[in-house]
């Protein structure tokens, strides 16, 4: 504007012609305003309203902006300020009044709040009138809005400093200049820091404390003192009263806002930014500026943060970081049409954020080398970037023009009702309001120009990131910066299938704030930022997305620092899919890797899916893992680590279909045999160190139950009996502290049980059950071989002989093991009354049915016709001599496959074997996925898909149908072979 024009009064200038939506309504609003001016005896305003130029302009504004209409009708003296003064001088006078209000002698906090609200409203309306009239261009409008916010913030800060000094909580060096050396640093961030505030902006603040300043007082109380002052500052500015509010305040850009005080000591802040600062925080700090309080200290901390924000060398590795921020700001690929109505002018495609980000990313990459690129304002930095050759002059001009155009639209949207919204109205009247305030009487014309602007911005923005690698994110925003939920991100997450989108945002922000050991390094957070869209997409496809992602969060929480997990997942999609499968389908496996993250290491071996975990395979790896370890506790801990990892890996093979349920049972059993045997060796060596050896000692472990039949599941206990023998003349061991043989082996067994089942930092090897020993819990935990044979021949119950059919020596002296095998076979071959045997088996099955009825149709073990019936058929047939194979098989399925034809015809045998395999595959998968027995309604969706795969059936309904058919067939066979049909 010219100097002469700048000295002219408001309505003496050329004003933008605005058209009301409804001329009659506009005239009525103007009449109401004139009546209010007469009531308050504002003759100058009444005269002004009688002039056509003023009346036309103001009536249009009163109709278009309900907020300005309400403010002028409530406080018509606002117009009195521009009756005889230029708008510039009128605004300057208001700002001077605001600045002085904080130091008025005797003013109370409530009086200050009233004064600030009234003066702010006056300034707000004047700025809006100047903007709508085009007396101010958009740049001047943002500048004056920033002046207003800075004046209000400064007044409140000065008032609070003087109040705290008067109360003795701080010691100001100069009460006439309370902000000088006060140590209370108030930084303006975002648009406030860049002097680019919009009409209804929040003001983003970060508050630091310079503890070295003399005003601070007690350094141990300063955080509490200044956090209280900061809380009062927020209240003064943003609490709504009868006079409205001054500015909404957002303090969530401070370091880790979920766990830090409102005012943070400078040292703690520097430590955070240097060690845990995130990419988006680097970008945010570009715009930081001291706006109130100790401005000198504020400039000093920004200077100290300069190396963090601005990398010293032109580092193209930083481009990966920039890409990761870009993904968070916009995860869509930009396809499809842009809808004008309902479009987000700030965050939408082609919006203000894309221009700001276009500038900031170039600054982050090049600003360390070129200080002239470190400015905090968007449009001036476009010019600097063009001067340095980082962008073309065409890009500079296009983006600068559209930036101010879009900011203009943003202001009009907000002027309607003074709300911080950036979304163009979708209804006809609302859209027309914005169009008319922009100077377009035809909304269609405005729509066309607005759409063209978006396309210009989108084209430039897309060109900037043409080479950015995509991670297949879902369409929509994915923004997890700061400490506030981005509305677009909430919508995206909901559309992806997340039920509690806000909770998911909070979880992901926790990752980015580095609160877990695995996310404390900047590199880890950068990789995680890159990976987040792919993670969210993968978990969303599990059909229970929230639950799966929370399990992954628990996994992250337990990971140690330094693990390169995120790089591994990024470079290995199969590993990512596997991890997602674990979290969605197998809560038990998820719990295991959460408690023992080291088990995840085994997945890095690409051969695990092709190598079958045989006994020889496991022995070879155990030998290498134990190495030269000789210390008792170290050996046991290594066994625990090895067992946990390989139980997990066997489970993963089952989960992925590399092995079936039968093979998994054999592998779990081989692993248990190996672990129990090595544990016994370690316990024996430790016992011998103190108590020596027993003359002629022989020890063996007898596996019972599912370990004996090589049918262990992921969570099975191990059933064991420890058998021993020694020379008849051995009275005690030969060590430093001798023990009688019986006591020696009891202690050996007790220590073995402790070694296997004691909870430690590395977990538990196995839960141990020794109740199948002679006389059960009443008998000694270690059994002499002669006592064992005598008991089995003379005193054992039928059910104990049934259990003996699965007894298998797994570790010990070879000759002793051979003797045990002979004893067992002799007992099993004893002549029996088959009818009585069948009656005993039936009675026991009925007792189980009474004491442990099946939970539902998915209780594969206890359901009539289920696993117990199959096991009882096999055990009955073994004891009755109806198994034809030699040597005698241990596994239930193998026994069933070798039933004598005269006992069970081939068709029945095939049905029993098929049923057992069907149950085994299902039960192995269920035990792998869940810690406890659970009904179908508790199966995670991913687990249902797993069960369909292991069963080879299309859906759960078909599995249930097949289960019922197998139950019917097996129960009929049980009744015929063991039931009354056997009589």
Curated annotation (Swiss-Prot):
The keyword ATP-binding applies. Residues 1-468 are annotated as: Adenylyl removase. Transmembrane segments: none annotated. Residues 473-983 are annotated as: Adenylyl transferase. Its cofactor is Mg(2+). It comes from the Bacteria. One of its GO terms (molecular function) is magnesium ion binding. Its EC number is 2.7.7.89, 2.7.7.42. The keyword Ligase does not apply. One of its GO terms (biological process) is regulation of glutamine family amino acid metabolic process. It catalyses: [glutamine synthetase]-O(4)-(5'-adenylyl)-L-tyrosine + phosphate = [glutamine synthetase]-L-tyrosine + ADP; [glutamine synthetase]-L-tyrosine + ATP = [glutamine synthetase]-O(4)-(5'-adenylyl)-L-tyrosine + diphosphate. It is an enzyme of class 2 (transferase). GO terms for cellular component: cytosol. Involved in the regulation of glutamine synthetase GlnA, a key enzyme in the process to assimilate ammonia. When cellular nitrogen levels are high, the C-terminal adenylyl transferase (AT) inactivates GlnA by covalent transfer of an adenylyl group from ATP to specific tyrosine residue of GlnA, thus reducing its activity. Conversely, when nitrogen levels are low, the N-terminal adenylyl removase (AR) activates GlnA by removing the adenylyl group by phosphorolysis, increasing its activity. Belongs to the GlnE family. PANTHER family: BIFUNCTIONAL GLUTAMINE SYNTHETASE ADENYLYLTRANSFERASE_ADENYLYL-REMOVING ENZYME, GLUTAMINE SYNTHETASE ADENYLYLTRANSFERASE. This is Bifunctional glutamine synthetase adenylyltransferase/adenylyl-removing enzyme. The lineage of its organism: Bacteria, Pseudomonadati, Pseudomonadota, Alphaproteobacteria, Hyphomicrobiales.
């Amino acid at each position: 504007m010219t100097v002469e024009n700048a000295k002219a009064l408001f309505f003496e200038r050329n004003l933008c012609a605005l058209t009301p939506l409804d001329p009659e309504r506009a005239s009525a609003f103007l009449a109401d305003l004139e009546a209010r001016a007469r009531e308050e005896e504002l003759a100058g305003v009444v005269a002004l309203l009688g002039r056509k130029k003023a009346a036309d302009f103001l009536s249009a504004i009163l109709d278009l902006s309900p907020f300005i209409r309400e403010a002028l009708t409530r406080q018509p003296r606002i117009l009195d300020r521009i009756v005889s003064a230029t708008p510039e001088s009128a605004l300057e006078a208001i700002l001077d009044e605001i600045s002085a209000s904080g130091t008025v002698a005797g003013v109370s906090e409530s009086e200050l709040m009233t004064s600030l609200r009234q003066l702010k409203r006056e300034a707000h309306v004047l700025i809006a009138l100047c903007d709508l009239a085009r007396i101010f261009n958009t740049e001047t409008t943002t500048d004056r809005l920033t002046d207003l916010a800075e004046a209000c913030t400064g007044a409140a800060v000065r008032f609070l400093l003087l109040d705290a000094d008067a109360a003795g909580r701080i010691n100001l060096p100069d009460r006439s200049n309370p902000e000088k050396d006060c140590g209370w640093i108030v930084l303006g961030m975002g648009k406030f820091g860049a002097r680019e505030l919009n009409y209804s902006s929040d003001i983003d603040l970060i508050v630091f404390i310079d503890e070295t300043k003399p005003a601070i007082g007690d350094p141990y109380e300063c955080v509490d003192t200044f956090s209280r002052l900061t809380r009062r500052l927020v209240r003064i500015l943003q609490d709504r009263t009868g006079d409205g509010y001054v500015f909404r305040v957002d303090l969530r850009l401070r370091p880790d806002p979920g766990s830090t005080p409102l005012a943070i000591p400078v040292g703690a802040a520097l430590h955070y930014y240097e060690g845990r600062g995130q990419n988006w925080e680097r970008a945010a700090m570009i715009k930081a500026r001291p706006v109130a309080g100790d401005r000198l200290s504020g400039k000093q901390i920004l200077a100290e943060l300069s190396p963090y924000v601005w990398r010293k060398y032109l580092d193209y590795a930083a481009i990966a970081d920039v890409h990761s921020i870009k993904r968070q700001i916009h995860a869509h690929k930009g396809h499809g049409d842009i809808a004008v109505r309902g479009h987000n002018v700030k965050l939408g495609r082609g919006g203000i954020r894309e221009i700001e980000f276009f500038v900031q990313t170039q600054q982050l990459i090049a600003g360390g080398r070129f200080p002239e690129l470190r400015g905090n304002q968007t449009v001036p930095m476009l010019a600097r970037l063009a001067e340095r050759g980082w962008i073309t002059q065409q890009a500079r001009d296009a983006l600068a023009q559209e930036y101010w155009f879009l900011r203009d639209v943003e202001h009009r949207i907000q002027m309607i009702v003074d709300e911080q919204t950036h979304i163009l109205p979708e209804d006809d009247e609302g859209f027309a309001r914005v169009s008319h305030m922009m100077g377009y009487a035809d909304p269609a014309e405005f729509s066309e120009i607005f759409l063209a602007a978006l396309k210009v911005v989108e084209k430039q923005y897309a060109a900037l990131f043409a080479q950015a690698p995509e991670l297949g994110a879902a369409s929509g925003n994915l923004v997890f910066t700061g400490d506030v939920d981005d509305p677009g991100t909430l919508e995206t997450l909901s559309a992806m299938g997340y039920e509690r989108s806000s909770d998911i945002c909070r979880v992901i922000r926790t990752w980015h704030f580095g609160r877990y050991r695995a996310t404390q390094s900047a590199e880890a957070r950068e990789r995680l930022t890159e990976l987040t869209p792919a993670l969210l997409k993968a978990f969303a496809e599990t059909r229970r997305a929230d639950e799966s992602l929370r399990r992954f969060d628990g996994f992250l929480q337990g990971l140690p620092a330094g693990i390169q997990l995120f790089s591994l997942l990024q470079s290995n999609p199969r590993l990512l899919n596997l991890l997602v499968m674990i979290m969605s389908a197998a809560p038990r496996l998820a719990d295991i890797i959460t408690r023992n993250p080291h088990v995840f290491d085994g997945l890095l071996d690409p051969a695990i899916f092709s190598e079958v975990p045989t006994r020889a395979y496991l022995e070879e790896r155990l030998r290498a893992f134990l190495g030269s370890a000789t210390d008792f506790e170290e050996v046991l801990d290594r066994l625990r680590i090895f067992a946990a990892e390989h139980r997990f890996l066997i489970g993963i093979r089952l989960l992925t279909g590399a092995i079936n349920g039968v093979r998994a049972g054999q592998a779990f059993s081989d692993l248990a045999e190996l672990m129990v045997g090595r544990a016994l060796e370690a316990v024996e060596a430790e016992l011998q160190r103190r108590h020596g050896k027993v003359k002629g000692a022989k020890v063996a472990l007898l596996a019972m139950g599912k370990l004996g039949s090589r049918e262990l599941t992921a969570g099975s206990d191990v059933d064991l009996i420890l058998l021993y023998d020694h020379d008849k003349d051995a009275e005690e061991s030969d060590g430093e502290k001798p023990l009688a043989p019986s006591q020696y082996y009891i202690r050996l067994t007790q220590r073995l049980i402790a070694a296997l089942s004691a909870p430690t930092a590395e977990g538990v090897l196995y839960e141990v059950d020794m109740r199948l020993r002679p006389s059960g819990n009443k008998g000694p935990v270690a059994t002499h071989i002669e006592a064992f044979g005598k008991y089995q021949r003379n005193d054992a119950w039928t059910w104990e002989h049934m259990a003996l059919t699965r007894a298998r020596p797994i570790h010990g002296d070879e000759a002793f093991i051979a003797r045990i095998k002979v004893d067992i076979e002799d007992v099993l071959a004893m002549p029996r009354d088959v009818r009585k045997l069948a009656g005993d088996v039936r009675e026991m099955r009925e007792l189980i049915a009474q004491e442990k009825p099946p939970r539902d149709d998915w209780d594969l073990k206890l359901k009539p016709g289920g696993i117990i019936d199959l096991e009882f058929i096999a055990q009955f047939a073994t004891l009755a001599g109806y198994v034809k194979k030699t040597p005698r098989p241990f596994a239930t399925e193998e026994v069933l496959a070798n039933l004598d034809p005269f006992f069970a015809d081939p068709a029945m045998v095939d049905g029993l074997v098929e049923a057992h395999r069907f149950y085994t595959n299902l039960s192995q998968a269920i035990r792998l996925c869940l810690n406890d027995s659970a009904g179908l309604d508790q199966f995670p969706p991913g687990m249902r898909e797993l069960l369909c795969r292991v069963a080879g059936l299309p859906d759960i309904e078909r599995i249930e149908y097949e289960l019922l058919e197998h139950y019917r067939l097996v129960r009929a066979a049980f009744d015929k072979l063991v039931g009354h049909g056997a009589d």
